């Protein structure tokens, strides 16, 4: 996975500084250790110019941002870079441009010792850990989420953990389960950021991850939401989204993890790489897995194409007045013209019988309707 | 496990697992559902009007054969009132196109439709066999694709037909959406996802090469279902691939589409839906509603389902070439960053990052300009340049030719146009009758 290391027998000079011996080939250029670190730092910090030190503000008016940490390569690297950046700001100007709040979402397999190690190494930030099922507790309009629970669960009063378990169990495919889990995780992170007073969320998505997301959401029928999901700036949730690592490839981050001093490997936990290759049967493979495999192979030989996909999608514009469109109850995206459900467009081949179900089917966007099973009878009875 | 009954009629035994939604159907119900869905696509998008004359782009392959069969069936069943004709383009490839055209001739007899065959040599003075002799096998697909795009419109104009239907299916459209994302081609997204496109006209001349509608009635039909339909109706179609593109293999987008379909059957339609939604998000695009209302989107650069539609339209070197070009763009952008880094190094020696000394913001690419459609100076066909691409390629071919045995008759005047049209039809009829012997 790391970038190609140059052969020590035929070492050549770093192409940037012309002084040190190169240890890595980045985008077809040999580069040394220091220049590579500077390369990654520059790419990330360049994206955060709006978070520079605000000398006009008083020290107690500190801006707060949230960093969701999954213990993967990308979010761990982002935390490392931001920590370094804040230390530099503090040592030069005796204050920082923002404060970091780190959130770890527990989906059942979280090892608390991992978070302790991170906290120990980057001690100057707030840390929180929340279970995923807290999304049912935090969302103010949780009634709309509860509507997707299976029939038997609606009547009873049960814990948020049981609600989450039964919701996921009612989904019929691995892609649907992965899709809903991702959506709920995003909602949880957003709600936590709002309630803790953060003005922005810094996601650790690399170029490769954003390209994967572009094609995965396209394949799930959420093309309309791509401007919200890929671009820096406003999100549909009244909070800003930023992707500081959007110009760095995933393989470059893997190299960075190995080369940082001390190495970040002890903090990183990437469980999926083995599991992804093992489960090649179509039963367990998800659309996200497929796109991940695809772009990891494209990235090896054609890294500029990966960048180009992200750049292209970044050009898509949110239509004027889009924020006033009705929202999907699950993912929260504004649906153009309120076209909910999978009916009522050119590709829908069924006649009027389903129109009644579509009207009473609630307010899910096309992509979420593909994941959540239809409950026409139950929904119509409400 | 006992055989399950059909999900629709609950009487017959289910023999077909439907690719689109994995429902189990018997043969009769599958055929009915397939045809009804095409009918639904035609009516909801208002593709046809009563009394309209429609040319079906027929290649002898499965898509156009199924299209012709379904349109004939629906035209009779629902009384569209259409006049259907078959229009074939003969690229002049021995051993491939002449065999597939035999299939089209048989189809014309079976369906009772008029058939017109136009050859590249008739339109351009060159057959693909001759082009390959001249330029070799590499790159000849470019000539064929450019010629074919124009040929269908010029053939329709000769017949006086204002509407051409093609056999593009959902897999083709979804593949094109993904390819355009991978290539970074946003303006093309709108064109490829629209079910109706047309060649805008600078003149109101009814006999000109413009003002011809194109539509794709099979846009929401899966390729696998088209094959199943052809099989269960015992349709006669030709399935050999083009002999001049043996190196064409499944492109990235094609393989990706097939993998997606395996993971989730609806993914192909989901990609088509996303493509339609994204087309409205492209900056500078006309505010159409999913391409349904916009019937005047220019067709000029729409990709045809070319020879060997089962193969990807991406040749192996495309991604490498694009990578090289994009890498150069990135290098140019990096020059700015490099200058910035150097200046920082001078100011703050040893500091990894200087604060508050940001120089240039970086490389800002210019917005792509919109294409303006005009007419080719030489042949009068639609073109955004002075001379259309086919004439440019033709000029290159003719320069290398020792002497011109066949002169291309350009249709400059109305009278000449009508004469050409009449001659074309007569020649086609002769060819048909010869084939009948």
Swiss-Prot record, chain A:
It is found in: Cytoplasm. It comes from the Eukaryota. SUPFAM superfamilies: Adenine nucleotide alpha hydrolases-like (SSF52402). GO terms for molecular function: nucleotidyltransferase activity; sulfurtransferase activity; tRNA binding. It holds the Pfam family CTU2. Coiled coil: none annotated. HAMAP family: CTU2. Plays a central role in 2-thiolation of mcm(5)S(2)U at tRNA wobble positions of tRNA(Lys), tRNA(Glu) and tRNA(Gln). May act by forming a heterodimer with NCS6 that ligates sulfur from thiocarboxylated URM1 onto the uridine of tRNAs at wobble position. Prior mcm(5) tRNA modification by the elongator complex is required for 2-thiolation. May also be involved in protein urmylation. Belongs to the CTU2/NCS2 family. This is Cytoplasmic tRNA 2-thiolation protein 2. The lineage of its organism: Eukaryota, Fungi, Dikarya, Ascomycota, Pezizomycotina. The gene is NCS2.
């Amino acid at each position: 996975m790391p970038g190609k290391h140059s052969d020590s027998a035929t070492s050549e000079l770093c192409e940037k500084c012309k002084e040190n011996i190169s240890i890595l080939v980045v985008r077809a250029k040999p580069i040394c250790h220091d220049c590579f670190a500077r390369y990654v730092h520059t790419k990330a910090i360049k994206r955060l110019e709006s978070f520079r030190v605000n000398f006009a503000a008083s020290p107690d008016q500190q801006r707060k941002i949230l960093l969701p940490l999954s213990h993967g390569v990308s979010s761990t690297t982002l935390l490392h870079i931001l920590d370094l950046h804040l230390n530099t700001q503090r040592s030069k100007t005796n204050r920082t441009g923002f404060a970091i709040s780190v959130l770890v979402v527990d989906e059942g397999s979280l090892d608390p010792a991992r978070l302790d190690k991170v906290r120990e190494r980057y001690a100057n930030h707030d840390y929180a850990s929340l279970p995923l099922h807290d999304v049912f507790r935090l969302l103010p309009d949780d009634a709309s989420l509860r509507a997707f629970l299976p029939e038997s669960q609606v009547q009873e009063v049960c814990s948020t953990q049981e609600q989450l378990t039964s919701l996921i169990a009612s989904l019929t495919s691995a892609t649907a389960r992965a899709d809903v889990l991702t959506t709920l995780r995003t909602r949880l992170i957003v709600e936590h950021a709002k309630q803790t007073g953060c003005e922005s969320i810094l996601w650790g998505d690399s170029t490769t991850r954003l390209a994967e997301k572009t094609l995965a959401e396209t394949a799930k029928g959420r093309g309309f939401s791509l401007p919200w999901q890929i671009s820096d700036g406003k999100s549909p949730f009244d909070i800003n989204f930023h992707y500081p690592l959007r110009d760095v490839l995933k393989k470059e981050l893997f190299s960075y993890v190995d080369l940082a001093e001390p190495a970040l490997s002890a903090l990183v936990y990437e469980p999926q790489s083995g599991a992804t290759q093992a489960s090649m049967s179509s039963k367990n493979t998800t659309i996200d897995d497929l796109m991940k495999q695809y772009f990891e192979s494209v990235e090896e030989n054609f890294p500029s194409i990966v960048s180009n996909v992200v750049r292209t999608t970044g050009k898509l514009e949110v239509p004027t007045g889009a924020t006033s469109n009705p929202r999907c109850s699950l993912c929260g995206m504004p649906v153009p013209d309120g076209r909910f459900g999978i009916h009522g467009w050119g590709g829908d081949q069924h006649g009027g019988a389903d129109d009644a179900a579509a009207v009473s089917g609630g307010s899910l966007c096309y992509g979420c309707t593909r994941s959540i099973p239809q409950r026409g009878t139950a929904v119509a009875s409400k | 496990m006992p055989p399950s009954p059909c999900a629709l009629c609950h009487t017959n035994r289910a023999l077909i697992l439907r690719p689109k939604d994995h429902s189990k159907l018997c043969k009769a119900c599958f055929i009915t559902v397939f045809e009804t869905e095409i009918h639904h696509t035609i009516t909801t998008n208002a593709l046809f009007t009563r009394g309209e004359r429609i040319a079906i782009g027929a290649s002898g392959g499965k898509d156009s054969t199924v299209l012709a069969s379904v349109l004939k069936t629906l035209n009779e069943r629902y009384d569209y009132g259409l006049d259907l004709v078959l229009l074939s383009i003969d690229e002049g490839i021995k051993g491939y196109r002449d065999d597939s055209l035999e299939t089209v001739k048989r189809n014309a007899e079976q369906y009772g439709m008029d058939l017109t065959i136009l050859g590249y040599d008739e339109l351009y003075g060159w057959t693909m066999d001759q082009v390959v002799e001249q330029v070799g096998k590499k790159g000849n697909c470019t000539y064929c694709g450019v010629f074919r795009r124009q040929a269908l419109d010029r053939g329709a104009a000769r017949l006086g037909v204002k509407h051409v239907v093609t056999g593009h299916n959902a897999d083709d459209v979804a593949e094109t959406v993904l390819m355009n994302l991978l290539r970074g081609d946003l303006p093309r997204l709108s064109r490829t996802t629209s079910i109706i496109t047309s060649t805008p006209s600078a003149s109101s001349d009814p006999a000109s090469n413009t003002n011809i509608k194109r539509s794709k009635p099979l846009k929401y039909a899966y390729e696998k279902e088209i094959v199943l339909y052809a099989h269960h109706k015992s349709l006669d179609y030709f399935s050999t691939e083009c002999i001049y593109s043996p190196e064409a293999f499944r492109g990235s987008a094609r393989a990706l589409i097939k993998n997606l379909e395996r993971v989730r059957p609806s993914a192909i339609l989901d990609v088509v839906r996303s493509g339609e939604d994204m087309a409205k998000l492209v900056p500078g695009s006309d505010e159409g509603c999913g391409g349904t209302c916009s019937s005047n989107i220019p067709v000029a650069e729409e990709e045809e389902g070319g020879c060997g539609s089962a193969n990807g339209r991406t040749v192996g070197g495309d991604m490498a070439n694009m990578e090289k070009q994009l890498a150069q763009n990135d290098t140019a952008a990096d020059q700015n960053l490099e200058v910035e880094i150097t200046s920082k190094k001078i100011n703050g020696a040893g500091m990894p990052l200087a604060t508050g000394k940001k120089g240039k913001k970086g490389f800002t690419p210019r917005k792509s300009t919109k294409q303006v459609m005009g007419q080719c100076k030489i042949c009068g066909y639609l073109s955004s340049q002075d001379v259309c691409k086919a004439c440019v390629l033709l000029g290159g071919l003719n320069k290398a030719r020792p002497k011109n045995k066949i002169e291309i008759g350009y249709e400059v005047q109305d009278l000449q146009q009508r004469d050409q049209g009449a001659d074309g039809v007569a020649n086609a009829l002769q060819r048909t009758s010869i084939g009948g012997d």
